[in-house]
C-alpha cells in the first residue's frame, strides 16, 4: 500500500472529497536511444559527469556553494561542496564572461555506434536544475556521419527545461553548443539531455481513465497491471494522416509514469500510481478520441528463456530477469527483486525440453517458492513471500456503493501436487469436498511438493472470496491486506484484483479478494 499522510486518510472519511488529480507523464522516444548513447563534452570540471546526462535515470542535483559570483549564499539553501556532488551532470571548468557569453562554446557530443532509424520528435534539455539556471543561447545539430540532417538554434530561452521540437531520424551524432548563460561569471551546467520529448497529461486532458491491477496469492496466474485512457483527438493531433501530428512517434514500450494527488489543506499531496509501457493504441482518422493501453514490465518477458535449467530458484529467477533486459529504475538500479529465501530451494528441469518463456519461468519460480509475483507502484518487479500483515485501510459501509458479494467455494478435501516422474504428494484437508491438483515442472522432490501443498491449502481452505464497488482511494494495491465491512461481519481480505476508473471526478473502484481471516 502506498503511504500517505494522516490528513489524506481523514479526507476519505468526509462526505465530499476535495479535488483529486492524475498526472500522467509520457516519454516520446525510442527507449533504446538512452542505452546506446555515448556522451562526451568539452571543458569539463574535475567532478563533471557528462557521460551520465543521457542515461534517462532520475536526477536530483544538489545546490552547492562555489566561488562563482553570488554562488555561495548564506541562506541555508547551499550544501558544502565536496569532490563528488550528487548528480553533477555536465559542469564546465570555464565561466561565462561579464556579458554572460562563453569565449569558447561548451559543447556536448552524443554519439551512437549504429545509425538510429527510429523517429523521435526532438530533444529535452534540463539545464542547471539544482541552482535554477539555464542557457539563453544554444544550438543543436544532428548528423548522419558528416552530413548535417537537422539543426535548431535558440537565442532567447528563459527556462530551466528546453524542448527542441524537430523530427530526428537516421542519425548517429548530436552536437549541442552553448553560447550564452543566464548570468555572468557562471559555469555552464546541464543536468540531463533527454533524447525525445516529455509530455504530461492531467485530468483535464483525459477523456477517460482506468487503472487495473491483479495478482494471485499462489502465483498460479500471471500478475497484470495496466492503464487505459483516452485523449482528445478533435484537432487531429493523433490522426495518423496528419503530417504534423504526433501519431508517427508512437512506439511500443514508451514509458508512462502515473501519479495520483489530492488537495490536502490547500496543498496537493501526490502518490505513486505506477510505471507502465505503451502496448496498444488506436488513433482513428475519423475519431475524436485517441485511446491508449500501457502495461507493466511483464510485457518485456515474452522471449524464450535461455538461462540455466538447474540451480537455486533465486539464481534461475535472476538469470531470467537479466535476460529480459528490463529498463533500469530511475536511480539506475535493477528493476527486480528476488527474495533471498529462494536461494535455499533448488530445481532441475534440464530433461524438460519445453520452450518456456521468461515470464513462464518466473511464475513457476514464484509458485514453487510459495511467493507472490507482481510489479509494485514504484515499477519494481518482485518475487517474495506475501506480506500478510493487515493494513489500516477499511472498506466500510460508508465507502461502499453496494453491500459486498461473498462467494463460497466447495470444501477442500485435499491438495494433490505432482512431482518428479509421475509421483504425487497428497495433503488431506477436510473429510469431504474437492481435490485441488497442482502441477509445476520445477517441483522435483517430495519435500518441495509438500511445501507447495501446505501453502495451497492455507490459501484455499478459507473458501470465501469477496467483491464489491466502492469510493476508491488510489493508495490501495493488489495483494494489500485490508478490512472489508459486510452486513454482518468484518472481514480480513487479501486483495487479488482492483480497478480504478474516473471520468473527471473522484475515483470509483471495484475490488475482489480472498477472505483470509
Residue ranges and their predicted role:
Residues 1-308, 367-368, 462-470:
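Assembly/oligomerization scaffold segments
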Residues 103-104, 114-119, 125-129, 133-148, ...:
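An acidic/polar, Gly/Ser/Thr-rich interaction patch typically located in mid-to-C-terminal regions
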Amino acid at each position: 500500500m502506498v503511504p500517505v499522510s494522516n490528513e489524506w486518510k481523514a479526507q476519505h472519511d468526509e462526505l465530499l472529497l476535495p479535488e483529486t488529480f492524475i498526472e500522467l507523464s509520457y516519454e516520446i522516444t525510442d527507449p533504446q536511444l538512452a542505452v546506446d548513447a555515448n556522451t562526451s563534452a568539452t571543458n569539463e570540471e574535475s567532478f563533471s559527469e557528462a557521460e551520465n546526462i543521457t542515461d534517462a535515470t532520475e536526477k536530483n542535483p544538489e545546490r552547492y556553494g562555489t566561488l562563482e559570483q553570488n554562488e555561495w549564499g548564506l541562506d541555508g539553501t547551499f550544501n558544502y561542496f565536496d569532490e563528488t556532488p550528487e548528480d553533477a551532470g555536465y559542469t564546465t571548468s570555464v565561466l561565462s564572461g561579464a556579458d554572460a557569453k562563453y569565449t569558447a562554446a561548451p559543447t556536448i557530443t552524443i554519439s551512437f555506434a549504429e545509425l538510429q532509424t527510429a523517429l523521435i520528435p526532438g530533444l529535452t534539455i534540463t539545464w542547471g536544475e539544482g541552482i535554477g539556471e539555464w542557457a539563453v543561447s544554444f544550438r543543436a545539430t544532428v548528423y548522419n556521419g558528416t552530413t548535417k540532417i537537422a539543426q535548431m538554434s535558440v537565442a532567447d530561452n528563459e527556462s530551466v527545461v528546453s524542448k527542441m521540437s524537430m523530427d530526428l531520424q537516421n542519425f548517429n551524432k548530436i552536437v549541442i553548443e552553448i553560447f550564452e548563460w543566464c548570468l555572468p561569471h557562471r559555469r555552464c551546467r546541464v543536468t540531463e539531455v533527454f533524447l525525445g520529448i516529455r509530455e504530461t497529461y492531467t485530468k483535464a486532458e483525459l477523456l477517460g481513465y482506468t487503472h487495473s491491477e491483479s495478482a494471485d496469492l499462489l502465483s498460479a496466474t500471471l500478475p497484470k497491471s495496466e492503464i487505459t485512457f483516452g485523449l482528445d483527438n478533435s484537432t487531429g493531433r493523433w490522426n495518423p494522416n496528419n503530417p504534423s501530428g504526433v501519431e508517427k512517434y508512437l512506439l511500443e514500450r514508451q514509458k508512462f509514469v502515473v501519479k495520483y494527488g489530492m488537495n490536502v489543506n490547500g496543498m496537493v499531496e501526490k502518490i505513486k500510481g505506477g510505471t507502465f509501457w505503451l502496448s496498444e493504441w488506436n488513433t482513428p482518422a475519423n475519431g475524436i478520441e485517441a485511446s491508449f493501453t500501457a502495461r507493466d514490465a511483464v510485457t518485456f518477458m515474452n522471449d524464450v528463456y535461455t538461462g540455466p535449467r538447474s540451480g537455486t530458484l533465486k539464481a534461475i529467477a535472476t538469470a531470467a530477469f537479466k535476460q529480459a533486459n528490463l529498463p533500469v529504475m530511475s536511480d539506475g538500479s535493477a528493476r527486480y527483486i528476488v527474495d533471498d529465501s529462494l536461494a535455499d530451494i533448488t530445481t532441475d528441469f534440464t530433461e524438460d525440453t519445453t520452450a518456456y518463456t521468461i515470464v513462464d519461468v518466473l511464475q513457476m519460480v514464484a509458485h514453487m517458492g510459495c511467493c507472490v509475483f507482481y510489479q509494485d507502484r514504484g515499477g519494481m518487479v518482485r518475487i517474495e513471500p506475501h506480506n500478510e500483515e493487515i493494513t489500516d485501510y477499511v472498506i466500510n459501509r460508508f465507502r461502499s456503493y453496494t453491500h459486498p458479494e461473498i462467494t463460497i467455494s466447495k470444501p477442500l478435501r485435499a491438495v494433490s501436487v505432482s512431482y518428479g516422474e509421475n509421483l504425487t504428494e497428497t495433503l488431506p484437508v477436510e473429510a469431504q469436498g474437492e481435490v485441488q491438483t497442482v502441477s509445476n515442472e520445477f517441483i522435483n522432490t517430495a519435500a518441495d511438493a509438500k511445501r507447495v501443498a501446505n501453502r495451497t491449502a492455507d490459501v484455499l481452505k478459507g473458501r470465501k472470496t469477496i467483491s464489491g464497488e466502492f469510493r476508491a482511494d488510489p493508495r490501495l494495491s493488489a495483494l494489500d491486506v485490508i478490512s472489508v465491512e459486510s452486513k454482518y461481519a468484518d472481514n480480513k481480505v487479501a486483495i487479488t484484483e482492483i480497478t480504478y476508473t474516473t471520468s473527471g471526478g473522484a475515483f470509483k473502484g471495484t475490488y475482489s479478494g480472498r477472505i483470509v481471516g
